């Protein structure tokens, strides 16, 4: 993994200026991967001098001294230009998150922070179930106001599809019907995609068709969804 130099700060400055001049509600988030980075493209930036090792790879990269201190250095450099600071981590570690937050807030007390509750972590390898449950609340107390799971949808959709395929293979339509019953039950909690035609806006386009007089081709009025899902 390579580290982006802090000399890239003019890019943040330009983005901040453009957003402010245009009056656009833009959120600029600065991310650093310096916690795990092992290489950096050059050694000419004075802000990198404490972390560049004077040893180069065959491709010309400099070796980089990674870790939380490098993340803090970059975070402090990014803070004047970024709405959110995000340091990417290798494990879910509250102590590490606190060290970063404390160092940033000592200089920029109102700086908002971001944290990736990554699906690349084996969560139960590092935290108990109770610790997993309180992890994000503890992050919030430290100033991590934007917390997210990258690729949560990818993992949930693939697991759900795999489990449905297993049930369908073993039990045919009974396997699908069981999932459908869970959909019906979930409607009480706000789930809406039982009626997939409605969910994708078919009713809206039916209204458009009716408004222009093309009523013979509307989809919802005679559909099985309209007849069977109420």
Where are these regions (language model features)?
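Extended, intrinsically disordered, low-complexity segments
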Residues: 119-121, 129-130, 134-145, 149-230
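Active-site mouth loops of central-metabolism enzymes
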Residues: 29-72, 119-131
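Conserved, mostly hydrophobic/aromatic
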Residues: 15, 78, 139
